[in-house]
């Protein structure tokens, strides 16, 4: 008797999603849904706006540039959804991550109201509020779960466009988010072991750094003539994983963190 009941239940479910007449005037039957599908979203890209709340909203809603979400600042930050996740927002520009290019088509962009650098030398930065980060963490967890996004694919604009972008900056709390299971981070014990090894063996050459950076997702060209490009990529990497010093120079701690991340699955 169970089979007829299941059959009736299935037919009832189908009858709820029968033919629909859309605005264009033709009929679409949505009774069946294919199992062979997944989300178009592979990446989450984080930005700061460099503007106040009012200007951020105006720029992101009245111009070509846009983002899926905008998180304001103040005592009670507001999370706005400006673009549906199923549609493309124009936030990433020329970009690359793990060989994927022009990430607008496959990412969710999140803009956070924050001034970024407070001086021309970019040595002073505005911090993010704890309330902003609490809201952001909840959003990131939800997005990552719904779209099945790998931790390594939650990135900053500077990670995917290191030659021209520096947001979300060195004060963005990547490590604190990683402790909540959001994003990629390194193992400190292994990094200390790698540091001891490099103190004994010496620092690897520029080709080693280029290869490891490419291995963990960054776009960087091989060759001794690409030192300035490599320096900017290293600076983006350091802002993300070693924000206490982000001069773009290769050093033992940077090498140790790179080595650990490159060994992660």
Predicted regions and their residues:
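Bacterial N-terminal signal peptides that target proteins for export
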Residues: 1-3
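C-terminal motif of bacterial Sec signal peptides marking the signal peptidase cleavage site
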Residues: 11-13
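Active-site-adjacent loop/helix surface patches within enzyme catalytic domains
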Residues: 18-37, 42-152
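Second-shell loop/turn segments in exported
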Residues: 32, 57, 96-99, 120-131, ...
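Acidic, His- and aromatic-enriched active-site or binding-groove loops in soluble protein domains
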Residues: 36, 70-71, 170-193
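Acidic/histidine-rich, metal-coordinating catalytic segments
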Residues: 149-164
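Short acidic, glycine/serine/threonine-rich helix-capping segments at coil-helix boundaries
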Residues: 197-261
């Amino acid at each position: 008797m169970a089979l007829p009941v299941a059959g009736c239940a299935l037919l009832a479910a189908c009858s709820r999603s029968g033919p629909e007449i859309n605005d264009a005037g033709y009929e679409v039957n949505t009774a069946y849904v294919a199992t062979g599908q997944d989300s178009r979203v592979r990446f989450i890209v984080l930005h700061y706006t460099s503007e106040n709340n009012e200007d951020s909203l105006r720029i992101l809603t009245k111009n070509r540039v846009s983002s899926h979400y905008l998180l304001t600042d103040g005592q009670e930050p507001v999370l706005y959804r400006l673009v549906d996740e199923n549609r493309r927002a124009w936030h990433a520009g020329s970009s690359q991550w793990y060989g994927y290019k022009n990430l607008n088509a496959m990412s969710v962009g999140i803009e956070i109201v924050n001034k970024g650098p407070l001086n021309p030398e970019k040595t002073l930065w505005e911090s993010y509020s704890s309330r902003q980060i609490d809201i952001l963490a909840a959003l990131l967890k939800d997005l990552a779960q719904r779209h099945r996004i790998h931790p390594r694919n939650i990135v900053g604009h500077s990670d995917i466009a290191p030659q021209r972008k520096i947001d979300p900056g060195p004060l963005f709390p990547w490590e604190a988010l990683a402790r909540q299971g959001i994003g990629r981070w390194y193992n400190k014990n292994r990094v200390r072991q790698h540091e001891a090894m490099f103190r004994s063996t010496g620092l690897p050459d520029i080709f080693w750094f280029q290869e490891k950076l490419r291995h963990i997702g960054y776009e960087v060209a091989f060759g001794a003539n690409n030192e300035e490009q490599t320096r900017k990529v290293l600076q983006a990497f350091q802002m993300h994983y070693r924000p206490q010093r982000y001069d773009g120079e290769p050093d033992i701690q940077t090498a140790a963190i790179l080595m650990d991340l490159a060994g992660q699955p």
